[in-house]
Amino acid sequence: MSAMTGTACVPHAPRLTPAWTYRPGPDVAHSPPPGLVEAQSLAKAAAMAALAFAAPGVTEREVELAGSDHLSAAGVEHVWTITNVGVGSNTHICFPTHPPTDLAIAKRDVVMVDIHPITPAGFWGDCTRCRVIGDYPEAVSALRDLEALHYETLEKCRPGMPANELFGLSAQRLMPEGFELLDLLANIGHSLTPGAAYLHNFIDAGNETPMWGAWAVEPFAARDGIAVKVEDLVWFGRDTCQIL
């Protein structure tokens, strides 16, 4: 009974708090939350499972379902935005308004999968991988070179660096190697906070936001008409950066 109101006290459920306590700025955690690491590991595995299903004649929607099956088997019930699958001309578009279609994989093709699971614990993952189908040496070369410059750029990440500086490091490699940035918003990634992407905007030429916590880095580019993309999460910790 409440002494002030004279009404009976109703027991409350435990206070609800986010699975990932967000601490922006230099007081961010040294290491990424284990749940975030798990979510990204699952995203990478699901992307690879989807690509493993890819073969000539298989449609974008069927590739998407292969990725969804992998997520469902891991207990995932939701994604935070659609799974993007691109083959043929559709590899040149990767955007939330462009869902998988009935376009089938050709004998020589590139298959792109961008997947975004939410784990049962509430953590978000974000991963893009590509696979070359058939005898397509130009595509193999484009994908290999993009992945190489991507990971070399990630090695230059440092805690608190401005987003536009990371963009510049990537851009100064893309153009000399013959790549044209394809992202519709002219960026190479975005922030990823608990329950929200893009809260700190994008990794682009105009964003001076210091990078702390999780950011998705995803160069999406074409060379000689062949579109390729790769994406990883980076944890910008208090003292070091870690590729998840």
Per-region residue spans from a language model:
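Active-site neighborhoods and metal-handling regions in enzymes and metal-associated proteins
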Residues: 2-244
